[in-house]
């Protein structure tokens, strides 16, 4: 059975592959030796850059507290520099949800059961 880190790493790769199939240039940002990284994936399409953090969840409620401080700081800086709103790609129950970061910040948590599914995936 895979541990949380392995499950997360698999989802990050899966998400990059899905974006590439959708016509994006997508790149996984490898963590530094200390494990820190600003976010997991940067992608571009039609001249617009996007950033994503990838999370897996076994619970339907996804809280802002799942983001690390360095990720929040990076998302905030991205917005200040004029980037498109960052998203958290959450994989829950074999579905991927794209959660708008500013909404997550405003509301504190999101109930995935009420969200639009971005992609269904097979295990």
Give the residues covered by each predicted segment:
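Intrinsically disordered, low-complexity terminal regions enriched in charged/polar residues
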Residues: 97-123
């Amino acid at each position: 059975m895979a541990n949380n880190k392995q499950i997360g790493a698999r989802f990050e790769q899966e998400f990059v592959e899905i974006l590439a199939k959708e016509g994006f240039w997508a790149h996984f940002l490898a963590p530094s030796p200390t494990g820190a990284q600003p976010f997991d994936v940067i992608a571009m399409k039609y001249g617009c850059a996007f950033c994503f953090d990838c999370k897996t969840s076994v619970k339907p409620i996804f809280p802002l507290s799942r983001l690390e401080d360095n990720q929040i700081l990076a998302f905030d800086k991205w917005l200040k520099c004029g980037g498109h709103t960052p998203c958290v790609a959450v994989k829950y129950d074999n579905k991927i949800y794209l959660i708008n970061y500013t909404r997550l910040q405003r509301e504190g948590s999101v109930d995935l059961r009420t969200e639009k599914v971005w992609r269904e995936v097979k295990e």
